[in-house]
Amino acid sequence: CIRDSAHTWLDETVYKNNIPSNELEKWFKVEQERFSELVLRLFHTELEAVYEEFNRGQDNDGRLMNYELMDALFPTHPNGQQTTIGKSEHLKNPSMVAIHKYFNEYYVPNNYALVLVGDLDFDKTILLAQKYFGNFKPKALPKKSQIVEKPMDKIVKRVVKSPSAPRLQMAWRTDSYGTKEARMAELVAQILSTNNNDAGLLDLNLNQKQKVLRAMAYVLPFKQYGYLALSAVPKENQSLDEAKNLLLEQIDLVKKGEFPDWMLTAIINDMKKDRLKGWETADGLSSSLYNTYIRERSWEQELEDIQEYEKITKADIVKFANDFFKDNYAIIYKEKGDNDKLIRVENPGITPIELNREAQSPFLKSILNEKVEEIKPVFVDYQKEIKTDNINGVKLSFIQNKKNNLAQMNYIFPFGTDNNKELSVAFTLFNYLGTDKYSPEEMEKEFFKLGINHNIRVDKDRINITLSGLEEDLAKGAELFDHWLRNVKADENIYKTVVNTILESREVAKKDKKNIMAALTSYARYGKNSRFRDVVSKERLLSAKAEDFVSMAKNIVNAPYEVFFYGKDLEKFKKNLSPIIKKSNAKYDLPAAKIYAEPSTDGKVYFTNYDMVQVEMSKVGRGETVDLKDFGKSSVFNEYFGSGLSSIVFQEIREARSLAYSAYVNYSRSGEKGKHDYVINYIGTQANKLGQAVEAMNGLMANLPQIPAQFDNAKNSSLKQIASQRLTKQNIYFNYLATQKLGFNHDIRKDVYAEIQNLDLAKLTNFYNQKIKPISYNTAIIGKKENLDMAAISKMGEFVEVSLEEIFGY
């Protein structure tokens, strides 16, 4: 199994496996065994892991806001009265008898579906399903009376507090998925906030004009009921009520019908395109299939759903909005402050389990010994798959889309923020500007009318401009973008607002736990001279003029670039794009790329204080420079020792000793020739268990554990992952670009596969002893200082407390 996971949500529990097609019958055998009888192994250690998950949720203010929102919208229905993880009292006295009863009542064949998507022989697969699941006996399901909520007739206000920046969320209860009201709500949400372009009313009137830091609308439909939500992050010195009023003003525009007549057609076309794109992947198609089952709908109904949307008129939307949007919503204010509703579940203190990793049951032996026809890996011949051509002297790379009418083109520029860090500001500003022909709002509307998505990504060494949509519209989209780039107009007022937004966003980032941890880990890895800290200064932003950055964006039309096209008809693309794609004869002054050093990691412990229930620790150690000859060994090391449910770290730290909810060790390979690899060691746990968890991790890493059977499984899993992986579509081209950065022009998976085939535990141990064991680490820790065992932390190395200003660089 390449990937094994599961999730639980309001109406579903879904187990997900990604398996090679040649292992399908083995998978059926294992799943037959797993779902035929419940065996609660590792129960008390896994229970403590659930305590950890509950406590991690206390540090996630998005989750806390959602709990309050659901409770307010659904005061009697399980949607709002029963969270997925449960309440603290549910976790304190769990009953194994009740768990068995639940399994026996609900894990019955008339209450679940098998959803299989991929390289399948359908007739054989159906026979396998019958063979292994056909003898499961259906049972009458427990009867549940349908709970009907009373209509909401007032505004329900709730407050959540945490250290992060303020924001708000407001929502109206809707009817269930598949109903006319749910469809109406979906269309209104997209009129307010379009999925793929910034052409909705919130996008244009609030985000584009920067009246708030961020605003959006969305619909979340359930099997019974659902909701339409609007959210906003206010600007500095803007109250939550002011942001709320701005959101309500946009709803009033919908009520008045003040949105373009063409918008519904554009939204529905966008929905069709999203459906095509989603069904191109196994994950996307399988999700659609299992959601159809959960919602008790037929696949025919799902396919015909778009036709139901097409029947809805603008007049229908206006009437719906006036009937639907009343003072009957829930609103959650997320204020900055101490969480006064904090609930901590204390760990009971458990006895660690001794895992016998060498033991194999007769069933496991039979599965492992069963021979299957081997899947042969398919490696890409880039020169064969990527056709090269040119348009007016500009290099053109082409991969044919043989599936549908979706197309994509990319302008690739071989430089980025390492050459000029101000490029990121230039293109941030660019997105808010218009031309002599189109205002900023009109520009977004034109792209949306065409059904063309546009995106500009500025990386450290590359600028990638992407245009995507239906192939028949791509040339018009390229023409529009070319007009925008060549004719963009500087606007001093918009620039000042963009600067304020950038500076306010930086302050918001300094209040967010994830951003703080990312900044602290970067500081532990690189020190002060890092890309993370090297941002355009506040002084430069305030003293510069709009034209300084606009000219920078416009000037890239004179820079060297190449084009990638993914679609059906190359010759038609060349003909249509010939007037647009041209090689400039003008000189383009490109500054040399700045070099960011990768200093040695020498044993320091960097700490930043943050008010949270748990503590997070990330140790980063600089290894040797990247070497293709080690790719196979590092892959197997991660699989065997450090990452995933079958790794030694997960089994020992979480399953056997329950010292952390999340723990892993990852050998992170550099993607660039001449740069260093890093080893990352992460633990997320309760503050009082950090010392024990670190001690256990250090014990595991002192010497690579020698477990031959587990090594064989990890090796075989790594081989099967490569053998069953298929690089397709646009991925071939971008994988090729990544391979070139390492200094190669061939599919390096071939080298990795051959290396793993010849790998044994002795060779992996030698790699560990030479490349990993000698590494010294810097440590990043975030948590509430008063909760930490400073004596345990002081043993990790030289302790340095760093401020937010030090780690962020502003």
What kind of feature is each model-predicted range?
Residues 33-40, 133-140, 248-259, 483-490, ...:
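A common structural junction motif
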Residues 3-33, 64-89, 111-117, 166-176, ...:
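M16 family metallopeptidases and their MPP-like homologs
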Residues 123-159, 199, 204, 276, ...:
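Proteolytic maturation boundary segments
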Residues 40-42, 94, 312, 487-496, ...:
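Peptidyl-prolyl cis-trans isomerase
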